[in-house]
């Protein structure tokens, strides 16, 4: 469905056996990536905001939207979590119903057509979250929501693995997970694997930060693995990896409809308009209370 595929993309951490509570966050990432025509950028954003509003008001789908900071320009990524394949149909139906309630059937179809006309290209992927390969992943739903809710940037590396080399690449990630979890300075790393919508085997290795400064002064791969481990890392990369593409994204709250548990972590960021409206009402309330009687009952003109 192009536009209806909302998302909540983020994935590459490192734990050999993920806790049941973390699995409750969903085992799949439903990802929709688009490149927007430069001259259509304003239209794209306006249409997306309409879709956000419809899904928010009528209990449709939830997703996070990210836009490129470093990488191919005018690229946006919409990401949602799914617990299984069946939930994909369920959430798509909820999103369609929300659009029909907000715009009418024909109006919803018109918005989708206009949205498609804004795009240079689009791509859909279903990714399985590899908790067994992820490092320092949160151990409960609240911890996961806090990690996502406080994040403002996502650095993700798409690793294309050569045919026949997936087992050794997975073994390397497990070695990196084990070594990284012993290093108190190593940040969380989330790993996912494309299972629908790709050519060949692709893994996404991702890290989240609350600001650009969070990418400074992190331990290097050599420091985490040690000299022998780093040599093994280089050898397996040379043998198993066809290409690795790194992109830095920032979260776009105005184009997102985050799950409530994520939004409440930083509501001023994820729901800025709602917070501004609440603040405005608070500020104007005293004026109404202090309004003079004359103003409430202005003189009638003949």
For each feature predicted by the language model, list its residue ranges.
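Small/flexible residues
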Residues: 6-7, 157
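Bacterial N-terminal signal peptides
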Residues: 9-18
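N-terminal secretory signal peptides that target proteins for export/translocation
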Residues: 1-5
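Short S/T/G/P-rich N-terminal loop/turn motif that feeds into the first structured element of a domain
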Residues: 23-231, 236-302
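Sequence-pattern detector for short linear motifs
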Residues: 7-8, 290
């Amino acid at each position: 469905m192009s536009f209806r595929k909302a998302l909540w993309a983020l994935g590459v951490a490192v734990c050999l056996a993920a806790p049941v509570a973390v699995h409750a966050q969903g085992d799949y990432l439903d990802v929709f990536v688009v490149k927007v025509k430069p001259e259509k950028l304003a239209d794209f954003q306006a249409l997306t905001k309409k879709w956000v509003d419809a899904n928010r008001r009528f209990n449709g789908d939830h997703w996070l939207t990210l836009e490129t900071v470093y990488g191919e320009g005018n690229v946006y990524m919409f990401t949602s979590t799914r617990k299984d394949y069946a939930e994909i149909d369920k959430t798509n139906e909820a999103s369609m119903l929300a659009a029909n309630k907000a715009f009418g059937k024909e109006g919803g179809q018109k918005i989708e057509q206009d949205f498609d006309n804004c795009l240079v290209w689009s791509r859909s992927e279903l990714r399985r979250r590899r908790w067994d390969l992820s490092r320092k992943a949160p151990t409960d739903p609240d911890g996961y929501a806090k990690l996502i809710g406080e994040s403002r940037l996502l650095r993700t590396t798409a690793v294309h693995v050569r045919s026949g080399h997936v087992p050794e690449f997975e073994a390397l990630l497990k070695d990196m997970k084990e070594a990284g979890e012993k290093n108190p300075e190593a940040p969380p790393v989330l790993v996912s694997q494309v299972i629908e919508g790709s050519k060949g085997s692709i893994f996404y290795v991702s890290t989240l930060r609350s600001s650009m400064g969070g990418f400074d002064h992190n331990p290097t791969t050599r420091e985490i693995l040690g000299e022998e481990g780093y040599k093994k890392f280089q050898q397996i990369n040379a043998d198993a990896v066809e290409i690795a593409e790194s992109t830095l994204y920032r979260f776009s709250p105005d184009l997102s409809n985050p799950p409530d548990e994520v939004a409440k972590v930083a509501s001023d960021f994820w729901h800025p308009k709602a917070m501004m409206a609440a603040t405005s009402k608070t500020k104007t309330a005293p004026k109404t209370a202090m309004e003079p009687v004359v103003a409430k009952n202005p003189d009638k003109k003949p």
